[in-house]
């Protein structure tokens, strides 16, 4: 990923002004006015870009912060998958808060305005966030694959998840050190270097032309092509297992011998309002587990698909530029500039898309988001608490739901029947 690299100064900018000390004041004032009018001041389409960046900035920061708060303040949401989702949100907050504003200014001015130190830091943090995101998504896919295919071989726990997250944050900064080492800030117009930071670029400097080809080829394979290929295979197997047949551990004999709760109660001489027998309750629990796993798998597949689509343009453009040497001499410079600018925006749009995906595909996250917004915005209902309900209130709610289920046994019977059609092939 290369959001901070600049394609170069725009056409029409003077290529030299001689000795800066000999420039007449009236010429300098005219030249600065020209820079503001024709170079710095955003054009119409750039105002659209600014609005798009601002929207992504707000949605990404607010949405990912709410994701972290929802898991932190609710013990029932502290699952292994949600730990990894929080880690992904932290990486998104990092890249949005630190790197997005710099990328916006670079795309608008086509100049690096932040000096030599940040020229190394900001691209480095962007590369680290990419590595963290890819490794986190890979660990999620691996965890889900083991949970579906080998539930007894590997027991996933919160402690192991936290250890994996620490490992991700230890490995990612280490492997991305070369990105910081090769970044250098230089001026396209050296005669203006002491007077303005305009026309400065933050780009890679390699000792040999072969090195960037090797580095960016490996970067593309390790951070995009290989992990996405492995994750696609894992989710394909998960999809086939969950939607094609019963998950491991489902009791086929229980399904074959299952009788409706009302029939079992009548055989035992009990009324229709009695509690369902253990066998029916076990079957309902398996149906509930199946549905929960399907919902989680569907949400994670969408997250992976959106990540792949958002990072595809910048990954391909970087390979074409760094490995094959394209875009150095081009007649349609504006089209190249537009492609790079849009691909930069897509990278940050992925950070804003994840909380939206959680909202639409996860009922628990949706409840927490609604509770948070109801505290801040009027008209959204009573202000709910982000905390999990107390055990007493949960027990009371469970008792009421049991009474309601007993009083409407026919409805419960219909729910179980529809559940059977979901599980049976």
Curated annotation (Swiss-Prot):
Entry keyword annotation includes Cell membrane: yes
Site positions for Important for responses to orexin, renumbered to this chain?
A: 36
Instruction: List S-S links within the chain.
Output: 119-202
Give the transmembrane region(s): 47-67, 83-105, 120-140, 161-182, 214-235, 299-321, 337-360
Question: Organism's domain of life?
Answer: Eukaryota
Q: Does the keyword Cell membrane apply?
A: yes
Keywords, ordered alphabetically: Cell membrane, Disulfide bond, G-protein coupled receptor, Membrane, Receptor, Transducer, Transmembrane, Transmembrane helix
How is this protein annotated for GO cellular component?
Answer: plasma membrane
UniProt lists the gene as: HCRTR1
* Family annotation (PANTHER family): G PROTEIN-COUPLED RECEPTOR 15-LIKE, LEUCOKININ RECEPTOR-RELATED
* Protein name, entry field: Orexin/Hypocretin receptor type 1
Q: Which InterPro entries match?
A: GPCR_Rhodpsn, GPCR_Rhodpsn_7TM, Orexin_rcpt, OX1R
Function in brief: Moderately selective excitatory receptor for orexin-A and, with a lower affinity, for orexin-B neuropeptide. Triggers an increase in cytoplasmic Ca(2+) levels in response to orexin-A binding.
**Where in the cell?**
Cell membrane
A single Pfam family, by name?
Answer: 7tm_1
């Amino acid at each position: 990923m290369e959001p901070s690299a600049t394609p170069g100064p725009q056409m029409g900018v003077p290529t030299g002004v001689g000795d800066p000390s000999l420039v007449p004041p009236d010429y300098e004032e005219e030249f600065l006015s020209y820079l503001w009018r024709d170079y710095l001041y955003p054009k119409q389409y750039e105002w659209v870009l600014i609005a798009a960046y601002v929207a992504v900035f707000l949605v990404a920061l607010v949405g990912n912060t709410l994701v972290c708060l929802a898991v932190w303040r609710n013990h029932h949401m502290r699952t292994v998958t949600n730990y990894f989702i929080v880690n992904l949100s932290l990486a998104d907050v990092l890249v949005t808060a630190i790197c997005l504003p710099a990328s916006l200014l670079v795309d608008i001015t086509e100049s690096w305005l932040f000096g030599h130190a940040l020229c190394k830091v900001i691209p480095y943090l962007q590369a680290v966030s990419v590595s963290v995101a890819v490794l986190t998504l890979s660990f999620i896919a691996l965890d889900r694959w083991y949970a579906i295919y080998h539930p007894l071989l590997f027991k996933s726990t919160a402690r192991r998840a936290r250890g994996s997250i620490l490992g991700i944050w230890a490995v990612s900064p280490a492997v991305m050190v070369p990105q910081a080492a090769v970044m250098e800030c230089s001026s396209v117009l050296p005669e203006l270097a002491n007077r303005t930071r305009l026309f400065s670029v933050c780009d890679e400097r390699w000792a040999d032309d072969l090195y960037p080809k090797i580095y960016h080829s490996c970067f593309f394979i390790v951070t995009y092509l290989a992990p996405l290929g492995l994750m696609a295979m894992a989710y394909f197997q998960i999809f086939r297992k969950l939607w094609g047949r019963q998950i491991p551990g489902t009791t086929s004999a229980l399904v074959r011998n299952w009788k409706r709760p009302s029939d079992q109660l009548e055989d035992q001489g009990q009324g229709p309002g009695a509690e369902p027998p253990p066998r029916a309750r076990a079957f309902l629990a398996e149906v509930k587990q199946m549905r929960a796993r399907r919902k989680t798998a569907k949400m994670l597949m969408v997250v992976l698909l959106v990540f792949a689509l958002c990072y595809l343009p910048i990954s391909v453009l970087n390979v074409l530029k760094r490995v094959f040497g394209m875009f150095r001499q081009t007649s349609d410079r504006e089209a190249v500039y537009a492609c790079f600018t849009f691909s930069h925006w897509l990278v940050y749009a992925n950070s804003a898309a994840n909380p939206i995906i959680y909202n639409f595909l996860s009922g628990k996250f949706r409840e927490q988001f609604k509770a948070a917004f109801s505290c801040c915005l009027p008209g959204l209902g009573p202000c709910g608490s982000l905390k999990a309900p107390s055990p007493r209130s949960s027990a009371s709610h469970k008792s009421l739901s049991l009474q309601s289920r007993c009083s409407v046994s026919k409805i419960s019977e219909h729910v179980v029947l529809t559940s059977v059609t979901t599980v049976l092939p």
